[in-house]
Amino acid sequence: MKYVYYYDTVIDPRQDERWPDKNTQERFQEIVKGYHLDSTMFLAPTTIRKQIDLWPEGNRFVRLLERESGEKTFLRVYNDMYHHPFETEITAAFKRLVMELPKVGFLTGHGERDVKKIGDRDYNTFTWDKPFRNSLLNQGFDVEEVNLNSPIPKDINILVIAEMRSELLPTQKTNLDQYIARGGNLMILSEPKRKEYMDPLLAEFGVKLVPGQLVSISEDHAPDLVVVKPTKEGQELIYHFDQIAKLEYVVVNPGVSGLEFNPEKGYKAIPLFETDSLVWNEMQTTDFVDDTARLNPDLGEVQQRYNTTLALTRKVNGRTQKVMVFGDADCISNGELSSGHKGIRASNFTLIPGSFFWLSDEEVPIDVRRPTPPDDLVYLSEKEASTWTIILRWIIPALMIILALVIWLRRRGR
């Protein structure tokens, strides 16, 4: 692999703070001086730009993969503790060179979550954030924004509708219905306050938002912070969700609606995540800071287990159409993916590879699982383990020392 060293302008607040009055060339000289590097080994901005435009990559270190026929793709490094790509990212990059991979369209025009913005409620992190390992771009997907003013392009494999905040116009509804009728896969994410706009859409799939907002009483967290776990059916359907359960993680929903399903529309439903039995649909309280949520059955509040995520399927045009419905749109937002909740072992980011793996018919992200080796289990009781600890840590080393002394004494005697 050929490596080319260069320097160019980057977005780096630390450099701006350290050298506020210096330009790119002057900053470059300061850096090479500090690292004792030869400045002549680096191509200047004007030179590297003649070879390739790396501004869309943030002028970061990247690897360019290129075929003789001209196809190109980037293999990036990431802002995590491992930095370099794993087998999943490497394989996805090579597959991108030789085949068409799924394209995900994100609906716009009705106040949906924005894939370009980095605000807490938006979706840039898991879609277009190139330094984020688990973003769709790095896992083999293409991403683009879609509006319903014209028919949805035929190369869109998965359509994401994340919290519409206004109703569809008749022509827009027609274009969406055409996509659904042709068997396109969808991911639909709602919010408790968007029932007015989301229920008409969800009704086409036999799904309805439970009135109110789910709450659960906690000593440490707000009532509207609801923790859900994968169902047994969800673990069997998507292996990523099985990993959440095995590692005893959960998914956090900061404001979520329960989901009800009716099979009259021809879909089959599989519940993926559910609450515990102490959760209820709060109909009255909306201020969970200064007010207290209390169960009131007279208002239609019911304390029970609620499904918060559903997987729907039906046969269309000889293939299986897949629809995934969430009662919460914040669970995979920028803010939720970049924050934590003390005392809660959350794994919300696992929703991304798991959901899109299923929606892409298990094409990407790449499944790199391997059969478990047959000799990786040691059957020892706690008492036996303690015994072997003593043998390995003390008895065997002592025998080795005694043997060494015997050999030394015999040689000395000779």
Predicted features along the sequence, with ranges:
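Hydrophobic targeting/anchoring helices
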Residues: 1-131, 135, 364-368, 377-394, ...
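Conserved beta-strand termini and adjacent loop/short-helix elements that scaffold enzyme active sites
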Residues: 4-8, 107, 146-148, 212, ...
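Pocket-edge structural micro-motifs
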Residues: 67, 76-77, 108, 273-276, ...
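Acidic, S/T/G-rich, low-cysteine, solvent-exposed domains in lumenal/extracellular/periplasmic regions
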Residues: 124-364
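A glycine-rich phosphate-binding loop feature that marks nucleotide/adenosyl-phosphate handling sites
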Residues: 218, 372-374
